[in-house]
């Protein structure tokens, strides 16, 4: 579950503790890699004290190395950053692994899947963006279904056990187009509803 569209994240996190959601997806934006910017780490750290769930941290930032040590302190399962950054990707992946956290790479809708190939042996997750990153409530991009299949084929051809996560515009209808993935990340569909568990169950 993602909180980009949440009006009251603390209350929503407490409600999610009573569901069977697998992870809390944490979107971090620096106002440079994407136009929007998230609140400071000091505030986010306070908010995420209220969840008992493991965190799936998505860094939409130009320099992941500044953020990895901070979010490694939390109850974090995955830290994912974008393959499109200009920084040393291997250095960032190694830093995440140093904290015994699973490392992932995220890929924008218009980025070629082949960009991931050099890093496949070192990643635990590929986060396929099914919207342009940086804002909640967007519609699922139709070509994402083919991209998910392409990523699955790539992992199979290289015999890589990484999981595929799909993020953006996920609801009870669009989830049917994500059959080749392992995890879906949904925000507005869950947090804007009256019954979190009902919406989560509809995505399984």
Indicate residue ranges for each PLM-predicted region.
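Catalytic cores of alpha/beta
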Residues: 9-16, 65-73, 111-123, 168-184
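N-terminal active-site wall of soluble small-molecule enzyme domains
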Residues: 25-95
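Glycine/Thr-rich beta-alpha phosphate-binding loop at enzyme active sites
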Residues: 30-38, 42, 109, 119-163, ...
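Structural motif
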Residues: 19, 50, 74, 99, ...
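Hydrophobic faces of well-ordered beta-strands that scaffold small-molecule active sites
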Residues: 1-2, 24-26, 55-59, 77-81, ...
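Alpha-helix-loop-beta-strand connector modules within alpha/beta enzyme cores
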Residues: 37-57, 95-106, 144-164, 168, ...
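Glycine-rich phosphate-binding active-site loops on the catalytic face of alpha/beta enzymes
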Residues: 79-87, 127-138, 181-200
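Active-site beta-loop-alpha junctions enriched in small/polar residues
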Residues: 2-6, 29-31, 60-64, 84, ...
């Amino acid at each position: 579950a993602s909180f980009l569209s949440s009006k009251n994240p603390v209350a929503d996190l407490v409600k999610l503790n009573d569901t069977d959601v697998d992870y809390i997806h944490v979107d971090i934006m620096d106002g440079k890699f994407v136009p929007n910017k998230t609140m400071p780490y000091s505030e986010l750290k306070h908010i995420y004290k209220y969840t008992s769930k493991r965190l799936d941290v998505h860094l939409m930032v130009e320099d992941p190395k500044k953020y990895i040590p901070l979010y490694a302190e939390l109850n974090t399962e995955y830290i994912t950053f974008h393959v499109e950054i200009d920084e040393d990707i291997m250095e960032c992946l190694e830093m995440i692994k140093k904290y015994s956290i699973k490392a992932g790479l995220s890929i924008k809708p218009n980025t070629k899947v082949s960009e991931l190939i050099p890093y496949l042996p070192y990643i635990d997750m590929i986060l396929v963006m099914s919207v342009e990153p940086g804002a909640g409530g967007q519609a699922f991009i139709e070509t994402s279904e083919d991209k998910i299949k392409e990523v699955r084929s790539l992992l199979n051809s290289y015999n890589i056990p990484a999981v595929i996560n799909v993020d953006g515009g996920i609801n009870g209808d669009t989830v049917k187009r994500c059959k080749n993935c392992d995890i879906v990340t949904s925000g507005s569909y869950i947090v804007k509803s009256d019954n979190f568990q009902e919406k989560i169950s509809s995505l399984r």
